[in-house]
Every structure is written in C-alpha cells, then in structure tokens.
Amino acid sequence: MATYTCITCRVAFRDADMQRAHYKTDWHRYNLRRKVASMAPVTAEGFQERVRAQRAVAEEESKGSATYCTVCSKKFASFNAYENHLKSRRHVELEKKAVQAVNRKVEMMNEKNLEKGLGVDSVDKDAMNAAIQQAIKAQPSMSPKKAPPAPAKEARNVVAVGTGGRGTHDRDPSEKPPRLQWFEQQAKKLAKQQEEDSEEEEEDLDGDDWEDIDSDEELECEDTEAMDDVVEQDAEEEEAEEGPPLGAIPITDCLFCSHHSSSLMKNVAHMTKDHSFFIPDIEYLSDIKGLIKYLGEKVGVGKICLWCNEKGKSFYSTEAVQAHMNDKSHCKLFTDGDAALEFADFYDFRSSYPDHKEGEDPNKAEELPSEKNLEYDDETMELILPSGARVGHRSLMRYYKQRFGLSRAVAVAKNRKAVGRVLQQYRALGWTGSTGAALMRERDMQYVQRMKSKWMLKTGMKNNATKQMHFRVQVRF
C-alpha cells in the first residue's frame, strides 16, 4: 500500500518529493476548487484536454479581436486593413501624442516619489522606452472597456522606479532646492542694487565740492550728462526687453492650475472665481501687472507656496506646488507683519496719509512756489522742503542707506483702469474692503456683540439658582 497519496486527486506517489511537487501543480489546484464546489475530481488526462480546449478558444478570440485599434478607437473588418491603419499618418500622430501623455504622467508621479524620498538608481533608457511603447501601443482587444490595463500600469511602475526623479533626468542629492536657489538670486539682486545705490550716493557727495570751471568745461559736462542719460535709457530698455526667467508662469496663466486666459484681467477674474484668490489692499495697488508677474516667477521658478513662503517642505515642480496650494487652501498671499514688505514696491499708500488731499493725483509732482521757504528741525536734524520732502543730515547716512526689498517702477496711471475693473469684480462677489466705512461698521458690530455678551453673562449670574442663600424644598414627603 502506497504511503504518499493525494485524497483530492485520488492518486498515489512513491516518495514525499513527488507528493510535494504535485501539490504545486495546476491540476491539484483545479481539483481543490472542484472539491469546494462538491464536484468530482478529474484525471490528469481530462485536465490536459480542458486546458487545450481553453487555449483554442482564447486563440480564436485573439484573432477576432486583432482588428481593433485602441489608440484610435476604431474597428476594422479584416486584419490587413488593421495593419494598413497602423502605418497611416493619423495613427502615428495619435500614438506620438499618447507617448507624450504617458511621459507627462510618469514625470508627475516621479516628482511625487522624489518628494516622498522614494528615488532609486536609474535603469537603462532602452528598457524605459520599451515600457512606454508597450503602455501606449495599440494592443488588440474586444472593446475599449475590456482592454487590459495591466501593461500600462507595469510600464508606469517600470519608468517610475527607473527614473526615480524628474522624468528622464536624475536629481543630484547635493543639488539645492529651487526655493533656496530663488532666494539666493533675489539676495544677489538686492546686494547688487545696494552697491549701485551706494556708488550713486558717493558720486553725489563728491559733487558737493564746488569748483570754478570754464564755459567749455561746462558744455563738456552737459554733453557727458546727456550721454549718461542716453546710456541709462538704453539699459532700461534692455532690461524691459529681457524675457522672463526660465520656468516663470506668464501673466495670462493661472498661478494655481494650468488654465490659460487671453488677457491679464481675465486671468485675475479666473483666479478670483475658481480659486478664491483676492489681492490684499487692492485699492492701493499701483502695479497689478508687476505683482502678477512677480508671483508667477515665485511659483514657477522658485516653486514656493504663496502662503507658506520659506516655511514648509520644498517642491521640485510647478505642478507639485500648485497641487499643494489647492489642497491646503493656500491660494492667498501672506502679508502679516514684515512679510508685507515683499510686495511694497507694487503698492502706493500715499492716498491714505492724513495730509493727503482728495482729488490729488499721487503721481503728479507738486509745483513749488516761487518763494522757497525751508524749515529745519533741530531734533531730527532734517531739512523740510516746500514739497514736504525731508532731507536728512550726512551724519545719519548709515540709516538712510538701508534698503527693504527691490525697488521697481510704479505706474499708477497705466494700472488704474485695470485695478478698477478688479475692484468691480471683487465688489460683485461681496467684497466690502478692508478700510473705510466697512471697517468701521465691522468694528461697531464687534463692540455691540461684546456688550451683548457681557449683559447676558451678568443677567445669567444674577438669576442663577445656585446663588440663592436659602433653598426651599419643592417636594414634601
């Protein structure tokens, strides 16, 4: 009598090795499923016949389904027509677009893996390209819904593990985050500007020593000054003609998604309606174009969240920082405390000054009277000009040299209409402003609420039953 048997398949074995090998076969697994269904087991020959029959049916189905193109979503009557379609120009173009779409998805997933610290060594580029081609290749299937998605998933996994970084380029671990690089660039610009300002001040101080010169020398100086003005104008024009930095978001593109608008105002309206993005103190905004351009560089080049700024984690792609701002509801500017100095060059708060006259153009230079009356303050050591400007003493120059942020040209006249249109959109959405009568009404309502709360607390404490000195029993037994 055989010692080693299989009760499910009803067979016997000579040794334990053959028995263990039998337990790993498909025949044994098939009989186990039949046993669960209370069906009789099949023999090895019967199982092989069933396998061959199933393979024949699968081949028949594959032949019939080979006339469907998954890329173009078209069905063909014959296999020859299907092969001719694969060589057509339209199919090649659609296949190329599919390859680009897969590449974009792979790069986005690799960026997420990189942020999570899942980057690994790269693999062969040929293997990666083969995986992408396999993912988008027109595989025959019965219908688009029944097309097996396994190859695409495998291809994405292969490419994601293979690249482990930004698409086809591997990120150097020693490379600085884009946010830090952008901050360093801004610091260099600020230092360069401070050096230029200090040089101009030194030239002004040197010019205080007056000397008698001839008329010819005066003409030469005038010519030199004219040439300097021309050179400065040319330099300004060159700076204006310089394009935006690489990766910066244009002023017609949304800062929080991939939406593109035909104009700046439509872009601002889109960000307000779809992302609830409001520009703070917009009634004092003087350069809306410059502000949106600066924010585009901050998000596109520096990969910086507008609310987190230097805090929070670093991002290595524009899509990642946009997704963060949308998910965390950070589609707003952080202007608390000293952070507001970052955007000071785009605002003009002169209209909020107490000595500002209504209807006065802040850009228009005041006409000086014929009689020059100058005032001097001994305490502050300042000379007050008729225009209201204050001139400090030379001994306090170290304090006047301080610079807070980059200085930019203010263009109120060019942006007044644009700011007005944005204000109309804000008011249409229920915005009441952060200053003026609306702010006073809000403060009054807060005061009324506080007084009401105090009165209710006082009344409740006065009528509280626990403060009764003598308690009368309500129930008598």
Curated annotation (Swiss-Prot):
Domain of life: Eukaryota
Annotated zinc fingers (U1-type), start-end: 4-28, 67-91
Residues recorded with modification Phosphoserine: S276
Localization, UniProt: Cytoplasm; Nucleus
Record's GO cellular component terms: cytosol; Golgi apparatus; nucleolus; nucleoplasm; preribosome, large subunit precursor
GO MF entries: preribosome binding; RNA binding; zinc ion binding
GO biological process, one term: positive regulation of kinase activity
Keywords attached to this entry: Acetylation, Cytoplasm, Metal-binding, Nucleus, Phosphoprotein, Repeat, Ribosome biogenesis, Ubl conjugation, Zinc, Zinc-finger
Expression sites (tissue/organ): Expressed in lung, kidney, spleen, liver and brain with lowest expression in kidney.
UniProt biased composition (Basic and acidic residues): 167-178
Positions where N-acetylalanine occurs in the chain: A2
Start and end residues of each stretch annotated as Disordered: 135-212
InterPro entries, A to Z: Matrin/U1-like-C_Znf_C2H2 (IPR003604), ZN622/Rei1/Reh1_Znf-C2H2 (IPR041661), Znf622/Rei1/Reh1 (IPR040025), Znf_C2H2_jaz (IPR022755), Znf_C2H2_sf (IPR036236), Znf_C2H2_type (IPR013087)
Function of the protein: Pre-60S-associated cytoplasmic factor involved in the cytoplasmic maturation of the 60S subunit.
Family: Belongs to the REI1 family.
Record note on quaternary structure: Homo- and heterodimer. Associates with pre-60S ribosomal particles. Interacts with MELK and MYBL2. Interacts with DNAJC21.
Annotated protein name in UniProt: Cytoplasmic 60S subunit biogenesis factor ZNF622
Annotated organism of origin: Homo sapiens (Human)
Biological classification of the source: Eukaryota, Metazoa, Chordata, Craniata, Vertebrata
